[in-house]
Amino acid sequence: MLATSMSLLAQGTSWQTATLISNGQTKTGTLDNNNTVAWYKITVTQEGHVDLVATSTGTLTLSTGSTVYGLKNDATYSRGTFTGATGTYSDVNISYHATDVGKGTYYIRIARYGGAGSFTLKYTFTPCALSNDPEPNNDYQSSSQLQSGATVQGRLGHRTSDDVTDTEDWYKIVVPEEGHIEFRAISTENLLLSTNGSVVYGFRNNATYSRGSFSGNGTYSDDTITYQATNVGKGTYYVRISRYGGSGGYKLYYKFTPCPLAADPEPNNNFENAGWLPSGPTKQGRLGYRTSDDVTDTEDWYRFTVTKKGAIEFTVTGTEDLTLSTYGTAIYGLNDNGTTYWIANFSGTNTYSNVTLTYQANDVEKGTYYVKISRYGGSGGYRLTYTGPTLTGDVDGNGKVSISDVTDMIDRLLGSSNPSFAIDDADVDGDGKITIGDVTALIDILLSGN
């Protein structure tokens, strides 16, 4: 009689008095006509699987109506019933298995179907094989940052004891310059990831907006989903990984690859901010990239100086999938009132757009001009080369380059507060102004024998 009383005290008679079972532990209880149910509880500290196995002795058979409960709003709710090894309604061996168990306390009611005797209840918890993501991260405000080249792990689809299922995780990336981004998410166990629900977002006007969803072999879901974009500009982007069904862990890989060509000096989207374009060297720039706040760079402006009347030539070539506009890419002059006027468009083999555009003109007067490089479609880098009239370094105008030209240039620089810019060939280094750099360039010409 004493043993029976101690057993009843150990097994609990309601969810409020349920006996705690630890992972890996087995508890013993007794059921008969007077004691038809026994209550236990488990505390789950992370996402994973729960296995419960009850085995009876004597004439006792256990009901498959034995149930696992969660607790929400101060009341229990069913998380599922046990199943029998052979019997539909009762058995001497019943079990419960769940793979989507989240954190919290759960309550277990073992119910008698018939007979009397003792039983054992064994509890086993197996954590999700992949580590958890840093919760909370269920919105963009609480997103954690990803680093290029790194893989993070997370979990989705697990349901807490108070009935909350983790259906999405948010991350963010900071893109420092124009380039490509790539994501790959791979799920484990029975977790399926949503293709339409997994999305990359930009941020404008204090709100997120879609920059595109992931894709997979399945239309709506897959265990492997990917996202790629080649036109990504600077800024912070947000990534939502969304569950379609099931539960388990996932691995998320992120990589950023910068545009292989150097960026042009922004801002240079109008003639007032035009960058300097010297004769000879090739400039690199980028077009077609869309920033996180939804601004696409569609044109770049440069300023160049023709220091003596003669021929000029331009070549611009796009890379990756960037195509350049023939009608938008043009040469401009500057009116006396400070506005530009159109001179001529570039040309290419196609009517509207080309990868390579060119412009040539003869007998161009001295002065400052502007060139606008305009995108037609795509994104990528470009190479721009300008070749102006040949600068001989004949500063004194005697028909040859000698030490007297060096002396003349130094005298002009030191002896005048306003050295003449009208002297042909004085701007030897081609930077649009006469400085000590031109003296150095002129000496280089003499030393080279040219």
Residue ranges and their predicted role:
Residues 1-11:
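Sec-dependent, cleavable N-terminal signal peptides
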Residues 21, 27, 31, 146, ...:
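Short clusters of hydrophobic/aromatic residues that line enzyme substrate/ligand-binding pockets
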Residues 26, 77, 151, 209, ...:
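Residue-level signal for pocket-adjacent positions within structured domains
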Residues 30-128, 154-259, 285-383, 435:
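Acidic, Ser/Thr/Pro-rich low-complexity intrinsically disordered segments
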Residues 332, 384-450:
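Cellulosome-associated attachment modules in secreted, modular CAZymes
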